[in-house]
Design a protein with these regions (language model features):
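Terminal and domain-flanking low-complexity segments
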Residues: 2-5, 100-145
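DNA polymerase processivity clamps
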Residues: 33-37, 41-46, 81-90
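Non-transmembrane, membrane-adjacent beta-strand/coil modules in membrane-associated proteins
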Residues: 5, 9-16, 52-115
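Activation on folded, globular domain regions of eukaryotic proteins
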Residues: 22-27, 45, 51, 66-70, ...
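Alpha-helical transmembrane spans
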Residues: 1-43, 144-145
């Protein structure tokens, strides 16, 4: 059996520790790339009676989620919520774009927040105009980050 000095043993422990930390860092980066989205697109089809949200993450992988039936939508609105966080974030609000359904429930459209009231007002006006337009079959809204 070979004898290992104390210094060699400590070097081995350090290299294993660095490998583990490096592996965890790589996993964290991959998780971030897969779960952070660079854009979301709402698409509603009046003829198919469905609204879907397509999300594209930082690796350009698309995922699609069925949101609601188009016939259940009454109007478009927003939810105002307080920013949670440290003492510097107290008092600030963010807004979530929602569909107000015919049964008065709200269904969140995008997972990302709007921090400016003017931005969400523009998107609400755009969506309401498209929904009220009788001639168009498709309603779309794209949100990029």
């Amino acid at each position: 059996m070979d004898k290992i000095t104390l210094e060699q043993d400590k070097k081995g422990e350090h290299s294993i520790l660095f490998l583990l930390l490096g592996g965890l860092a790589i996993l964290a980066i991959i998780t971030g790339l897969l779960t952070n989205y660079k854009n979301e697109t709402l698409t509603c089809s009046k003829s198919k009676d469905i609204c879907t949200v397509e999300k594209i993450n930082l690796l350009n992988v698309k995922s699609t989620k069925n949101l609601v039936k188009y016939s259940d939508i009454a109007t478009v609105g927003f939810l105002k919520q307080k920013v949670k966080g440290n003492k510097y974030a107290k008092g600030y609000s963010f807004y979530l774009l929602t569909f107000i359904l015919k049964d008065n429930n709200q269904k969140e459209i995008f997972k990302s927040e709007y921090y400016e009231k003017t931005d969400i007002d523009k998107d609400i006006a755009n969506l309401r105009e498209q929904i009220e337009n009788v001639n168009s079959d498709i309603v779309t809204l794209k949100r990029e980050y």
